[in-house]
Design a protein with these regions (language model features):
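Residues that cap or initiate secondary-structure elements
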Residues: 9-10, 41-43
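Short glycine-/aliphatic-rich beta-strand segments at the starts of folded cytosolic domains
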Residues: 1-7
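A generic structural motif
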Residues: 33-40
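Short amphipathic alpha-helix segments
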Residues: 8-24
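Charge-rich, low-aromatic oligomerization/scaffolding segments with amphipathic character
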Residues: 42-56
Length: 56
């Protein structure tokens, strides 16, 4: 499992990240201020998604 701190993301950023994760079939959970990605092998893909959405 890979953890991302989502507390600094806006509501819009989090919604966009969730939408993209769902579109790509990445299994995840939101737990408080953490985004938990269930498959360690998806880490690089999720990194790219998060970076592309939060750096705009």
């Amino acid at each position: 499992m890979v953890k991302y701190f989502a507390g600094d993301w806006t509501v819009q950023e989090l919604a966009a990240i969730e939408q993209e994760l769902e579109r790509q079939g990445v299994q995840y959970t939101i737990d408080g201020e953490e985004l938990l990605v269930h498959d360690d092998h998806q880490e690089r893909r999720v990194d790219m998604i998060v970076e592309s959405i939060t750096e705009t």
